[in-house]
């Protein structure tokens, strides 16, 4: 009993689909090689699978460009003309946009004003005035932020300075560090504490007594 006719339709199972593609791809490649050898034909074969993998075959000594050129020559068509025309149109639009932007920049710098009507000049003036207002507001905002940051730094330094002064006052508040300029005994006691006590605070106090800060 012969085999039934295989219905040609998409294979839904991905694994089966890939297996079938590989088998039939190899068969087509083999047929293309046979046509090249047996019939001295120029064969170009391109295949892209459902997984977006490219498979191709070209007869020995033949390039894809040569095949395209020969096809265009035989058929009398230009495969690239529409693409070239599209690229030319895009290039023209880019040049026009570039020229327009250069002219707008020049006008905002006070140049290329010839030919503008009174309405156009008034509109340009209004745009420039609005731009100046935005720039001024941005400048004031930046100055305000920087001023606030500087004030915070100054406040922190002042608080640190106050803490240091309070620490020094607490350290020198004891009677052993009291200095009386009119009492030589207090002066000698501070000097002795600085020399023999090896105390940094006492040494500083002694130095201040000799060279007071005014």
From Swiss-Prot:
UniProt entry keywords in alphabetical sequence: DNA-binding, Nucleus, Transcription, Transcription regulation
GO biological process: positive regulation of transcription by RNA polymerase II
Start and end residues of each MADS-box domain: 3-58
Cross-referenced Pfam families: K-box, SRF-TF
Subcellular location: Nucleus
Entry superkingdom: Eukaryota
One Gene Ontology term, aspect cellular component: nucleus
Tissue: In flowers. Not found in vegetative tissues.
GO MF assignments: DNA-binding transcription factor activity; protein dimerization activity; RNA polymerase II transcription regulatory region sequence-specific DNA binding
InterPro entries in UniProt: MADS-box/MEF2_TF, MEF2-like_N, TF_Kbox, TF_MADSbox, TF_MADSbox_sf
Domain K-box: 84-174
Main localization (coarse): nucleus
PANTHER family xref list: SERUM RESPONSE FACTOR HOMOLOG (PTHR48019)
Protein name: MADS-box protein CMB2
């Amino acid at each position: 009993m012969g085999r039934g006719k295989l219905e040609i339709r998409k294979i839904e199972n991905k694994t089966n689909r890939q297996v079938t593609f590989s088998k039939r791809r190899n068969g087509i490649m083999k047929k293309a090689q046979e046509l090249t050898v047996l019939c001295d034909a120029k064969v170009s074969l391109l295949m892209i699978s459902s997984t977006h993998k490219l498979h191709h075959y070209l007869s020995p000594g033949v390039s894809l460009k040569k095949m395209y050129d020969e096809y265009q020559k035989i058929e009398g068509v230009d495969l690239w003309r529409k693409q070239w025309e599209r690229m030319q149109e895009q290039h023209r639009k880019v040049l026009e946009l570039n020229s327009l932007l250069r002219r707008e920049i020049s006008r905002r710098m006070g140049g290329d004003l010839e030919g503008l009507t009174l309405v156009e000049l008034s509109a340009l003036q209004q745009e420039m005035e609005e731009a100046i207002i935005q720039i001024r507001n941005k400048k004031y905002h930046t100055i305000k932020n920087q001023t606030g940051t500087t004030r915070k730094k100054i406040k922190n330094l002042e608080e640190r300075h106050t803490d240091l002064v309070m620490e020094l006052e607490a350290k020198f508040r004891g009677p052993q560090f009291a200095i009386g300029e009119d009492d030589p005994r207090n002066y000698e006691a501070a000097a002795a504490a600085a020399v023999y006590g090896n105390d940094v605070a006492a040494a500083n106090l002694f130095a201040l007594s000799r060279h007071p800060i005014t």
